[in-house]
Amino acid sequence: MLGRLLQANQHCMLNNFKSPRRVVITGMGCVTPIGIGRKAFWSGLQKGESGVRRIESFDVSRSAVKIAAQVQDFDWEAQLDPKDRKHVPRTVPLALAAAREAFEDAGIAASDLSPEEKQQIGVMLGTGGGGLPFVEQHYAIWYQGGAHHKASVYIIPAATHGTLSSELSMAFGLRGLSHVISTGCTSSTDAIAYAAQHISLGRQEVMLAGGVDAPLAPGILAGFNLLTVLTTQWNDEPHRASRPFTRDRSGMVLGEGSWIYVLEEFERAQQRGAKIYAEIAGYGTTCDAYHR
């Protein structure tokens, strides 16, 4: 029994997708601090732009950390039905916008899909914080103001990371699997890997896969600062703050955004004449089991 378990664990560490079903990327969408959409994002990268700025969404006058990479010039309300705008965390419109662009880029119109086709399309997202800023905001109403009736009844759904994939599934009417992976900084990569595996094993034909996060709130900022992982040296020069490969690096910078791929079974993509960006041939995953 132990031998079989070790063999299974070794397979999980490096999965080369030995199934005859190949997995390819046919669509991409993103919302980032240096551009909305993949073309604007790529242009920002080519120009060497920085998306790090002084935080404006809440008071940072008493915080040692005053900067973050915030999404700019994004129409948050356009992504949601008016009745839903006050009931979902900031991560939901970020994910919706990226998913819409990814579908459009892949040449897939969700509104034209048959019920059978919608059963074959799933969602797999990665997130670290999910809806924590939304939860923090509304718990503050409870604990500080006492006006309980003003707190959202959606605090608990927002606190559940699964809300993110559910919102995408509902928005596009997708009836395939709908999961969220939360493994810290590797969440999005893990989500893409597991989504590809579902296609490789024949469980789904198409997957929306990627990640979204918007961890910008006073409590979260303070928590990361307590870990001493955020830079505090570049508050006056935010564009110089993110410098992981320099000798004078002093910590990371929090940011928000989303990136979502359309993953598709290779032969299906070929048959419909889809453009193919790349193939996912396999993935590796381990744990150092070292420290907190």
Question: For each predicted feature, which ranges?
Answer:
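Active-site-proximal alpha-helical scaffold in enzymes
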Residues: 95-108, 161-164, 169-172, 178-213, ...
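Condensing-enzyme catalytic core mediating Claisen C-C bond formation in acyl metabolism
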Residues: 22-26, 53-54, 237-292
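Flexible, low-complexity linker/loop segments at domain and module junctions
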Residues: 2-25, 112-118
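Short Gly/aromatic-enriched secondary-structure transition segments
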Residues: 37-49
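Short acidic, glycine/serine/threonine-rich loops at helix termini
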Residues: 36, 134-138, 192, 217-223, ...
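Conserved beta-ketoacyl condensing-enzyme motif
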Residues: 25, 46-183, 212-221
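Acyl-CoA/ACP chain-elongation machinery
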Residues: 203-250, 283-292
